[in-house]
From Swiss-Prot:
Organism listed in the record: Homo sapiens (Human)
Family annotation (PROSITE patterns): DAZ (PS51890), RRM (PS50102)
Domain notes: The DAZ domains are essential and mediate the interaction with DAZAP1 and DAZAP2.
Classification via Gene3D superfamilies: 3.30.70.330
Protein name: Deleted in azoospermia protein 2
One Pfam assignment: Daz
Domain of life: Eukaryota
Amino acid sequence: MSAANPETPNSTISREASTQSSSAAASQGWVLPEGKIVPNTVFVGGIDARMDETEIGSCFGRYGSVKEVKIITNRTGVSKGYGFVSFVNDVDVQKIVGSQIHFHGKKLKLGPAIRKQKLCARHVQPRPLVVNPPPPPQFQNVWRNPNTETYLQPQITPNPVTQHVQAYSAYPHSPGQVITGCQLLVYNYQEYPTYPDSAFQVTTGYQLPVYNYQPFPAYPRSPFQVTAGYQLPVYNYQAFPAYPNSPFQVATGYQFPVYNYQPFPAYPSSPFQVTAGYQLPVYNYQAFPAYPNSPFQVATGYQFPVYNYQAFPAYPNSPVQVTTGYQLPVYNYQAFPAYPNSPVQVTTGYQLPVYNYQAFPAYPSSPFQVTTGYQLPVYNYQAFPAYPSSPFQVTTGYQLPVYNYQAFPAYPSSPFQVTTGYQLPVYNYQAFPAYPSSPFQVTTGYQLPVYNYQAFPAYPSSPFQVTTGYQLPVYNYQAFPAYPSSPFQVTTGYQLPVYNYQAFPAYPNSAVQVTTGYQFHVYNYQMPPQCPVGEQRRNLWTEAYKWWYLVCLIQRRD
């Protein structure tokens, strides 16, 4: 088999580099593309989200003085899973490539770094090599360098056939170079750029269809560190940064399905600055102006397939200011006024589609600490800032599908005091007045259809304390009255069909004490795992698919 003439312009490989790389290729089973091997530089694949450049540099320090470590990321700062390590002095790249390096329990994929000249960027004729190694996985990576040259990672092939390497160009208009070619199951992946003309820069994000759980790392350049958590099958996750120009800092996290995203700017004439971002499928977009007769001006933009939206302002006469916004499919929306005789004024509205709930941790660097939980299938979410004149700082916003929500009083030992609102589908709404003998006045409203809600305590070993809530379909919900030994008395409303009740006490080792009531029929209680792996991850895929299939059947039957 013949190789390209090494003297050919724009496809030069030095004889020495060619000899070394051919030897490495013979041992590893690589088919090398034409190009120039970058001296003292190693391609590193298999980098997961937990690895940072400092750790990788330390790992490779055994081979020589590390000059630079570059992890390739997309526009949002999320690692693409590979990068390059360059050394100050001459190193034996062939020896490094042939070594076995495991990092965080994961084997790294190593190879020589190959620079492809610009004039040959459209077509690369590989140098064939006949080998018969055990079939390794295939991978191909490209790194766009500022000098307009392209680095090509050699492609692994299990058979002695000629492979053609297609170079993918990075996006020229991106503030950071992005490598495409990542295939996400079922749906296409789209990255949306930040909006340079917006007062608030938003990077949207991830469409992770049907399958696995992926945790997203905190964003080191963000003034608010976010550790996100849960990606619920079929839909997407995206985290929004806090808004520095807003008098109330809010960091929210959302999970969006299938459709497009548009961020809306804050409204400067509003005493409470709100920037909401929503997902707009199929239907038309309508933005509703602020209400001039309201003491608090709110302008929101939402995506509502088929249904209408109304946002309600805060109530100035209430000692605890709460503004909630919800999206109501199929059914009519009614907002109930605050109760003037109640020391705590609450107006709630609700929206009920069909899916799951997810909670995000509080943000320690925020002037207003917020523990929020959101679940957004086909519909929308909006979070409102805390209100400084309230004795209890509250940011609420929930979207609870066909299932139920129950709110618990503030937790005295918790660094974050939370008063939450409620979700009422199909059935009638009843608001219960505050209880004068309670040190914390709560007006609650409940609607209890056919399914369950449960809240989980914070995790004491987590740097971010999280009180999460999850939704358990098929069975019934019931709320029980306050616990007499609790310093905060709460009386709730009830719907007690069919099944048994069990109340679980607060967890004494938890930084946030929670007394919850649950009804668990047939199914077991599970705390959500941290980063499931192996067989456990495969089981989660299977369970997610079964639940999704069940929901589809229920919708079809309805």
